[in-house]
Structures are given as C-alpha cells and as structure tokens.
C-alpha cells in the first residue's frame, strides 16, 4: 500500500514541480506506511526541513485526493525505511549503470570505497599528486543567495553522502560565480567527515597533462589505477576536454569505473552539458545522469552580502550605502566584485581616507565607466529581440500578444537589473510606457522565475549573454 500510494504522489509531484526541484528534494524520499501513518524518510536533516517547509501542503493535498476520508497521518524522519537484505547483485551492464544513476540514492546498495594515499605507491611521481583541495574554500564562507541556492544545497548533500546523492553532480554557469568554491567546499567537507577519504580536485587540463605524461612514461596503467582509486573526483571547467579525443576516451572509462564503484564525481562547466561543443555525445549524456544545476549571476542582495562578507574578512567597515553603490554597478560575477573591493581597500590604505561613495566613485572610475558602456537599454532590447526572434520595434509597440508581451516584460526586468536607469526612464525607452507598467513587468518576471523553469532559464541565458 505504501509503495503504490507514494508512487501516485511522486508521479503527480513530478508533473507539478520543475525537474531540478523534483530530483533534488522529492525523489530521494522513501516511504513506509504502518498503522495508517505514512512516514517519509529523508537522507539528512537539511532535506527533511526543506521538504516539510516547501512541499508539505502539496503532499497533504495529494493524500487527501487519493485516500478520501481514510487519509493517513504524515510524519518525517531522517534515515531510510527498513528493507530486506539484498540479493547478490548480478553483473551490471552500462545500461544498468545508466538506469541506477537516476534512481534514489538510498536504493543504491554499494557504499563508496575509501582508500588511503598509500594505495598509490606505484604511481609515478609525475602523475601522483595530492588532493589540491583549497582549505580556505568551505561552506561556511560561501555566501548563499537565490542565484546559487540549489547548487549549494546539492553540494551539501553530496558532501554528506558522497557517491550516493546525485552522482555525477554537474554545476554550470559563467566565470566567477562560485562553482570552484563549491567544488573545494565539497572536498573539504568530505575529508572533514572521513579523514581517510581520497579526494582529488583538478582543472580538466591537469587530467589531460597527466594522461600525456603517463603515455610518455609508458605508465598508462598507473594513471588508470590512480584516477579510479579516488573516493571523489572534482574536475573544474570540463569544457576544456573539447576536441581532445584521447583524453575524452580515457575519461569516459574513468567516469564509468567511478560510477560503478559509487565514487563521487563533480564537474563544472561554463555551459549546459549538451551545449559543450567538441565533446562526444556519450560523455555529454553521462554528464546529465545525476543532477545538473545552474549557478546564476548573483542578484543585488547577494552581491551586497558578498561585499559585506569580504570586507569583514579584511576587518574593514563597509557602510551599507557604499556596498549597495558598488553592487548596483558591478553585476557580472563574484570575482569582479572582490577585485573591485580589493582595489577600494588598497586605495583607502594608501591614502588614509575613509571609504565613502565619493571615494569609491573615484577609486573605481575606470571600471564604472566601462561597466556603464557595456550594458545599455538599447543593447538589452536588441539582445532580447534576437533571442526571441522578434523585432526591436515589437518590444516598443503596443502589441499585447504573449509572443511579444513576455519578451517585453523580460527586457524591462533586465533593464532594471542591469542598468542604473529609473523606472520612468525605462518605461520611456519602451515606447513611452508608464513607470507602473515597468514595475508590474519586473514583479511578473520575478514571479515567473519562481514558477516557470523556461522563464528562469531564459532569464539566466540573457543575463549571461549581456554580462559576458
């Protein structure tokens, strides 16, 4: 009864929720029905609290719909339901691996194999290297916001249950948005939980270099043994595998071997897996076997929080109005924000002057001037029109069909987000519209970004295009 009832709920929730949300929060839940009490088991406290906060009403509604007057009471626990001892597993084919990678983490019976660095004694010196995980990048100094919330949540779950929760985890987004920080944070957390865990972080080019050295030294078997013995392999900028056929071939087999052993893989890229050119389709398909999450440019509040956090790290007092002044003008990525703040702090130290808005305007005058030239309302209109294959004149017209109205609302919201123009100025640039029309458009797009995966994806794509 419990399996069929919960299966009905799962099927309906899968239709109602965005695919990423369903995969991350709902699919890992297990169900058990006893004495008319349905217990949902979450893999950790974080997932339990999130599901209870976000989806409790939806689950109760479905139980009422499917059970009528005989609705079971609902409770949540951290853990897993009691299951019978598993039968010996048959030999698995690649198709079996593909099917299992999308199953709930708790149904995967094998545990990650933990090895120590001593296992690599036979690996030649050029190939054998330590973890490269940066101890400075941890979860507690990663600034969370709407733009990175899902990525951070997925990274935390992976670090709590490596090899079982979302394998592989694929993070994508523009430069300087925090993908590398999350990789290191996962690596640090895994080692904190298990000091014997073998975690390796590297840029994809290092993998290529290691393979070339192994071929030169006739040590390809040692290369394979080393990479397939890790508990977690964290590879940055996987797009640099493009057009490197021999490296892709070796990584393909390494990828399969790690997944077979329930060893964690986390990859990052500057674009969605299927959009990576020069990489074999079989690899791109595998990149999407687990969970794929976009890391978006930080919104204003997150940019301010990042500046305040970095100022605190430097033991510098940064007034709120100064942080907002910088954050409103530098929007593309975290690295740019940090660089600008470092310049402001250095100038303040050299001159002994207090950090005010006027001081920041002077210290960053060339950067601010360049930024204002980069994104204009005119540029936004042209980019949106091209993206939706309509004319700029359509955006300025009085037409109200959805094929025009929605892109117009998106363009207005982008103008508010990416420029310093007031609402009346934006309205005037869109065919002389009233500022209340612009405000309505901004609120509508903000709402749709929460409800519609397509609108969220379009908005992110346009932000990346305009900020690159």
From Swiss-Prot:
Signal peptide (residue range): none
Family matches, as PROSITE patterns: DNAA
Residues holding ATP: 176, 178-180
GO molecular function: ATP binding; ATP hydrolysis activity; DNA replication origin binding; lipid binding
Function statement: Plays an essential role in the initiation and regulation of chromosomal replication. ATP-DnaA binds to the origin of replication (oriC) to initiate formation of the DNA replication initiation complex once per cell cycle. Binds the DnaA box (a 9 base pair repeat at the origin) and separates the double-stranded (ds)DNA. Forms a right-handed helical filament on oriC DNA; dsDNA binds to the exterior of the filament while single-stranded (ss)DNA is stabiized in the filament's interior.
Entry keyword annotation includes Transcription: yes
Location within or outside the cell: Cytoplasm
Gene this chain is encoded by: dnaA
Organism of provenance: Vibrio harveyi
Region Domain I, interacts with DnaA modulators: start-end pairs: 1-84
InterPro entries: AAA+_ATPase (IPR003593), Chromosome_initiator_DnaA (IPR001957), Chromosome_initiator_DnaA-like (IPR020591), Chromosome_initiator_DnaA_CS (IPR018312), DnaA_C (IPR013159), DnaA_dom (IPR013317), DnaA_N_dom (IPR024633), DnaA_N_sf (IPR038454)
BP GO terms, sorted: DNA replication initiation; regulation of DNA replication
Induction statement: Represses its own transcription.
The name this protein goes by in its record: Chromosomal replication initiator protein DnaA
Keyword Iron-sulfur: no
Description of how the protein assembles with itself and partners: Oligomerizes as a right-handed, spiral filament on DNA at oriC.
Region (Domain IV, binds dsDNA): 349-468
First-listed, main subcellular location of the protein, grouped into a coarse class: cytoplasm
